[in-house]
């Protein structure tokens, strides 16, 4: 409401077939906002409107979008986008609608940032990181590139612009031809990739087709910042549905469960 340009608040979702649609619905409900797809929105006279079920148009003052930049506005970015809103960028430029997560503000989603996080902690805080990153290499630097090329068979290579488990390549599962081709691509676009040591995920027992079976999993912890900072006694466990698969992302078919730590903290 502090940045609303006049009108209702909207959570823009790609639609019910998106793997995180339930989350989008929950966010809209908790934020007292309308959940909308591109079909529900229209730009007219440089302003954004929500089209109600009875045909009424309601002015939109702020949008929290749950889709990538490329798909946001087919007039500005990908012309084949069916989930974006034509003209929303122009309305934003004119100051007629606020986009809470503005275009281009996802710099921290760039996987290349992983490489610099420990360095940022040392530079800005003068401290050593308490939690270690997975050893990360940026082939933009010659020394890292040399190591990546010599050890690609045991590394995980990631396209920095991708998310949700897309653009992740396991050197151990690639053929010699695929590795040679990837090296050529990295040589042409070294800033586009990072490489990481493979971290062995913990196996948890999952109920698959009525039987317990091990699946790779990871755990996401949450830090709560209020008057003080504390670690939440729980988190989110994500797990792969296929045996031996390391991709636990929901967009890759992975599952997730709330996880609670029972007992008093020591």
Where are these regions (language model features)?
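Domain-scale recognition of functional cores that engage charged ligands
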Residues: 1-266
